Amino acid sequence: MEDLRRRFPTKKNGEEISNVAVDPPLRKASDALPLPLYLTNTFFLSLFFATVYFLLSRWREKIRNSTPLHVVDLSEICALIGFVASFIYLLGFCGIDLIFRSSSDDDVWVNDGMIPCNQSLDCREVLPIKPNSVDPPRESELDSVEDEEIVKLVIDGTIPSYSLETKLGDCKRAAAIRREAVQRITGKSLTGLPLEGFDYNSILGQCCEMPVGYVQIPVGIAGPLLLDGVEYSVPMATTEGCLVASTNRGFKAIHLSGGAFSVLVKDAMTRAPVVRFPSARRAALVMFYLQDPSNFERLSLIFNKSSRFARLQSITCTIAGRNLYPRFACSTGDAMGMNMVSKGVQNVLDFVKSEFPDMDVIGISGNYCSDKKASAVNWIEGRGKHVVCEAFIKAEIVEKVLKTSVEALVELNTLKNLVGSAMAGSLGGFNAHSSNIVSAVFIATGQDPAQNVESSHCMTMILPDGDDLHISVSMPCIEVGTVGGGTQLASQAACLNLLGVKGSNNEKPGSNAQQLARIVAGSVLAGELSLMSAIAAGQLVKSHMKYNRSSRDIGPSSQVNR
């Protein structure tokens, strides 16, 4: 039997061995083709892209004309045949080439019998190739470095402050090092800003970047709030004296009068991108297309793919020249929903772009939403949860608990909250201090404090009801959620749990966030009732002088500077 070995180069005195069998050239995939490679490649590539373009164009025309896709003519049949043929060629050619290249090295063998006896093989040792080894995962590159050295590296800019969590793998250690670096760079002390007692892993990548500690805000409990027959103890995070006490007095007056009642009018988060067209006529055409009821089902299916909770409710548009502002409104389950609605809007924009290629998307938000800004569109159309809350306060409760009269409250509300706000040109500010209560509950329950701007839009109405008093608050823009954002932090989650609305409601998605909005409105109702009573009775200044003043010196002389 012939001894077969891998062929090695054989030389004698630096010259080629002439009588060694010469290997045939390596086979290529193109050897099987009757035509030159560049011709066949050019032909089939051109055929492939031409047929794809033709078929996609025809498919789009059929969708526009509501023609069934399975109805084809002769040109489409030819295009399909060309597409299949070119696809098989490209796939088969690449496959053959891959097989040939992977097997070419293993196929090059020589027969030692072809070499004359007076010649010897070059049997120099060939070292085997070691397989690539994957290094085991190493510990953090800075684990063995002292904190003092890392602080110096951060100060001189060698290590970016924002990368400490990634490089160290320890969020608390990163916060401590960053804190020390900030103190040395600024020359100011952070004494008083606590570092210990907080889970920094819980905010990584979702709540706060480059932390150096956390701010302590006291949380008070007001209540019980009797709302729709259920009692709630309401957490309020605030540094304003009298706020919790005043709201608590309002809760007492409402409870003694039979409680408050709420109505959820609407639940729809909004997002309004801005898109541009070559002309105003073209922009108007797309506006009519988006607002056409016959197109809503298709657009809603595309929008709702973004989430199992997102449900498109309406699309309203406004136009400014050749710029179009479509305002999408959708329900978002128990999430506040800004990310959810933005993803759905992006899906619709991609689809509309395919229908109207001349559309230019300027921005996913065009401020017609309108987020974190006082705006007429929010005040009129609403954003988030639209809640109305009311209570009937007995005349004797007004006198004994609130220390005023029905007539005084009615007159004050008209002249202050209605006429006074109108004279000031207020937008959504026809109330005494709804933002106080909204902010306090928002911070305690992990909501976005910046959305207090529109969430505090409120119309407070106080009217006589016989001898008694009817008070109501209408709040069209309460933007809250019980999942996502700051709601997952331990302190905020505990406050949500106290209210019975922690997390999502699997049985009835969205009901937890809706209930939280009702509680916010009920708390605002109590706060409005108590403050208006204090003003009517002339107690506001006296109470604030007693409970909302601080004599503690926080000037530079009392601080310890580093």
UniProtKB/Swiss-Prot annotation:
Result of knocking out the encoding gene: No visible phenotype under normal growth conditions, but 25% lower levels in triterpenoids content and 15% lower levels in sterol content. Hmg1 and hmg2 double mutants are lethal during male gametophyte development.
Protein name: 3-hydroxy-3-methylglutaryl-coenzyme A reductase 2
Family per similarity comment: Belongs to the HMG-CoA reductase family.
Subcellular location: Endoplasmic reticulum membrane
One record GO biological process: triterpenoid biosynthetic process
Regions that span the bilayer: 32-56, 77-100
Region Linker, residue ranges: 101-146
Organs and tissues of expression: Restricted to young seedlings, roots, and inflorescences. Expressed in root tips, shoot apex, secretory zone of the stigma, microspores, mature pollen grains, gynoecium vascular tissue and fertilized ovules.
Gene3D superfamilies: 3-hydroxy-3-methylglutaryl-coenzyme A Reductase, Chain A, domain 2, HMGR, N-terminal domain, Hydroxymethylglutaryl-CoA reductase, class I/II, NAD/NADP-binding domain
Organism: Arabidopsis thaliana
The UniProt record lists the keyword Transmembrane helix: yes
Function in brief: Catalyzes the synthesis of mevalonate. The specific precursor of all isoprenoid compounds present in plants.
Region (Catalytic): 147-562
Control of this protein's activity: Regulated at the post-translational level in response to alterations of the sphingolipid and the sterol biosynthetic pathways.
GN (gene name): HMG2
Active site: 240 (charge relay system), 372 (charge relay system), 448 (charge relay system), 544 (proton donor)
Record membrane topology: Multi-pass membrane protein
Positions of modified residues (Phosphoserine): 550
EC number: 1.1.1.34
Reaction catalyzed: (R)-mevalonate + 2 NADP(+) + CoA = (3S)-3-hydroxy-3-methylglutaryl-CoA + 2 NADPH + 2 H(+)
